């Protein structure tokens, strides 16, 4: 069975049973600070699982792009992936356990022709608060599963939620495929890691609401949330032992082999797998509609880590030229008809890969040489201290996970706690230095710097008007002569865009607008629509400076009383500051 056939078969099957298809959401979850990426098909549906009405009804189906980063170091084995697709179906208050299991069982045995003897399932065994899930157990038995195919586990294996201290939660039943390997012992089952059982589908039943006192009550609207591992099922259906044998990885693996052969190099099978897996994940992250860029924090940090890991494996065998773009093009070609954003953002993907390669390759060789010197210094205890591991980060840009991976190849342990202490000291010094040099981004509070400070607010507002509201300030510096403003954006501004930014700022100056200031809570400021990336330093009550029609920002000040005091505004230079960050230098008219 091909990948496209499996996707289509799944969606069509559920459509025939009254489900409406919903498109894959972004890899960046909407309004969920608890996770970096969309890790399951349920992420975009959380409000509806909590009771809101979905515009497409109560039965839904999707193929969702997902990224999970907890097992990056495991990538290269037979099963672990950072990027994957999840097939999912949902019932929002309609069908429940019996119908959900019946639908799942029918799809597996009738559509995919998996013999029921190859299935194993897990069921919640019950505890002092919630009884054993007999309904699930009896439903599976009614399908012909024998007692030795049904395994009972506690909350660690067969319970979902709540996300916080209280809220929706419930039991689940996981469906496994028996790979035919011999049992590892008398207690062998789906919960062990011997490889006999591979999980392919999970049905979560949101039945209870956990109350503040720790007790549970039945929910009025009971929901079903299911997720099937697309890559795993495709591997099993085609009789392969690992996901890298499937058509999902063969095109990029073949291209990588061509490059290796052309360079007369030799690369281990694990390194090949890491590169093929990571280039797929990186291509989807860079190609996401929200355009993630490599950086040193949050999603950008994970992206940078994946890219640098690939570069390191390629450099190991002296493949010097940047082949990442060649590999990424294979992914775009392969998936572009299904996920059109990859083709739409192909140029951006290639630009970012080139930039990150150029940025890292300059220091990688020196860094690897120094890492070897540091490893030679560890002595018999085979522990790399915090000072040396921090030097690799501070001087050569090696993420700590990167250093750990290098060290493990030489059977050396990294003192991560000592590294974290050094890193914290570095951050503290950096913050103190910044406060001494430019308090609030200003070199002083003189008349000229105050005028330029107000100009940065107008510039920020104009950039968001011209380029979009996903543009955010990334830093600023003001002297007597000019302002310097850094902002998140992925490419050079066109001449027309810069001219429009200038026009908007000068329009605000000509309109002679009073600059208003109000004190309010951070919550009130956000509800007002104020922007600001430095809220944490201002406390609970903040000042919001407003230039009506042009700007609302949380800020410590100071500012001019009227925009006319700026006289005029002109950009002097627009350039790259770092990956995904642009910089504008500008001046204003003299008094």
Curated annotation (Swiss-Prot):
Major subcellular site: cytoplasm
Record note on cofactor: Binds 1 zinc ion per subunit.
Keyword match tRNA-binding: yes
Top-level lineage group: Bacteria
Record SMART domains: tRNA_SAD
UniProt subcellular location: Cytoplasm
Binding site for Zn(2+): 453, 457, 555, 559
Enzyme class at the top of the EC tree: ligase
Enzyme Commission number: 6.1.1.7
Entry's family note: Belongs to the class-II aminoacyl-tRNA synthetase family.
PANTHER family named among the record's database cross-references: ALANINE--TRNA LIGASE, CYTOPLASMIC, ALANYL-TRNA SYNTHETASE
Name of the protein in its database record: Alanine--tRNA ligase 2
Species in which this protein is naturally found: Lachnoclostridium phytofermentans (strain ATCC 700394 / DSM 18823 / ISDg)
Source organism phylogeny: Bacteria, Bacillati, Bacillota, Clostridia, Lachnospirales
